[in-house]
């Protein structure tokens, strides 16, 4: 059995999705992700992962502050439904910055959820826009709407970097061609849709255990996601190590193998020793859980 029992509830829609429901869904996703145990290199119930400045309590405190902001993202998406999607992104930025400031105040200046604010702010706004247009709230529609919000963002924000000081995102793109969270959003969470969600869905069908399903999904994300958090901490060598080790564990069966959970704990210890934390994959895992509450819908909706 896995370390924590979590019971998912797929949303059965009989009325339009409300902002309050989005807030609740994001809160569940963030808490589910951080409490899932064992997660290699990441904060969980077992330990603080490869972090000295944050722990489970700081993530829970951050979640309590961040989740309510999703109502504002939802309303912004709803009220700008007539605005071109590429223009909405600029309108969302001040909301995101204010949310981030509240997070930093709650955590004493520690960045617990910056990536999650970016991802879930976009998804919440996408949900609001779909509700305003009377469209179904489905996985593919939500992700496609995020892609429309973010169209052209990577080239505009990363490829034209100037000046002497580059942000981490700019440096990763210019040096390695890695687009990070921006690229994932602009693609409409392609890694989630093509890697994570199929694994999670299959594991739920086979085991009925959401914890095992999420842990196996996390391994797949760590194996294939070009996580720029890992590059920031360990360079390309750190990213390659994590990907290769995750792939090795998957070849052995992952969490379904004999001793699979113990292998994850050992992987956790190794990443802590190497100071490697796959925070980007953790964010995508939370997105996977959030999206799993909604029907997939058509891949190319009309």
From Swiss-Prot:
What Pfam families does its record include? Answer: CitG
What InterPro entries does this protein map onto? Answer: CitG (IPR002736), TriPribosyl-deP-CoA_syn_CitG (IPR017551)
Supply the alphabetized keyword list.
ATP-binding, Nucleotide-binding, Transferase
Q: Among its keywords, does the record have Transmembrane helix?
A: no
> Biological process GO terms, please?
prosthetic group biosynthetic process
Which Gene3D superfamilies did the record assign? Triphosphoribosyl-dephospho-CoA protein (1.10.4200.10)
Q: Which reaction does it catalyse?
A: 3'-dephospho-CoA + ATP = 2'-(5''-triphospho-alpha-D-ribosyl)-3'-dephospho-CoA + adenine
Transmembrane regions:
none
Reported EC number(s) for this entry are: 2.4.2.52
Q: Which cysteines are joined by disulfide bonds?
A: none
On whether Nucleotide-binding is a keyword of this UniProt record, the answer is yes
This entry's Gene Ontology molecular function terms read:
ATP binding; triphosphoribosyl-dephospho-CoA synthase activity
This chain's function reads:
Catalyzes the formation of 2-(5''-triphosphoribosyl)-3'-dephosphocoenzyme-A, the precursor of the prosthetic group of the holo-acyl carrier protein (gamma chain) of citrate lyase, from ATP and dephospho-CoA.
NCBIfam families (alphabetical): citrate_citG (TIGR03125)
Tell me the protein family, please: Belongs to the CitG/MdcB family.
The protein, known as: 2-(5''-triphosphoribosyl)-3'-dephosphocoenzyme-A synthase
The organism is: Klebsiella pneumoniae
Its gene?
citG
């Amino acid at each position: 059995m896995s370390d924590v029992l979590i019971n998912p509830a797929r949303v059965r829609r009989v009325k339009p999705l409300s902002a309050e429901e989005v807030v609740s869904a994001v809160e569940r996703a963030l808490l589910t992700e951080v409490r899932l145990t064992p997660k290699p290199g990441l904060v969980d119930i077992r330990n603080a992962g490869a972090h000295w400045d944050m722990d489970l309590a700081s993530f829970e405190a951050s979640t309590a502050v961040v989740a309510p902001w999703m109502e504002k993202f939802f309303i912004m998406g709803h009220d700008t439904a007539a605005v071109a999607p590429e223009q909405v992104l600029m309108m969302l930025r001040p909301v995101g910055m204010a949310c981030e400031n509240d997070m930093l105040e709650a955590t004493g200046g520690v960045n617990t959820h910056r990536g999650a604010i970016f991802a879930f702010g976009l998804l919440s706004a996408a949900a609001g826009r779909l509700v305003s247009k009377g469209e179904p709230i489905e996985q593919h529609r939500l992700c496609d709407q995020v892609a429309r919000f973010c169209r052209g963002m990577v080239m505009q924000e990363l490829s034209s970097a100037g000046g002497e000081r580059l942000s981490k995102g700019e440096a990763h793109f210019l040096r390695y061609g890695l687009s990070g969270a921006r690229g994932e959003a602009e693609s409409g969470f392609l890694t989630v849709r093509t890697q994570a969600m199929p694994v999670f869905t299959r594991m739920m069908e086979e085991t009925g255990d959401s914890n095992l399903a999420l842990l196996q999904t996390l391994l797949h994300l760590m194996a294939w996601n070009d996580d720029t958090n890992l590059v920031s901490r360990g360079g390309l060598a750190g990213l390659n190590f994590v990907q290769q080790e995750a792939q090795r564990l998957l070849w052995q069966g992952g969490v379904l193998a004999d001793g699979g959970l113990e292998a994850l704990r050992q992987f956790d210890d190794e990443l802590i020793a190497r100071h490697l934390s796959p925070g980007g994959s953790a964010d995508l895992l939370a997105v996977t859980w959030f999206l799993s509450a909604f029907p997939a819908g058509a891949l190319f909706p009309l």
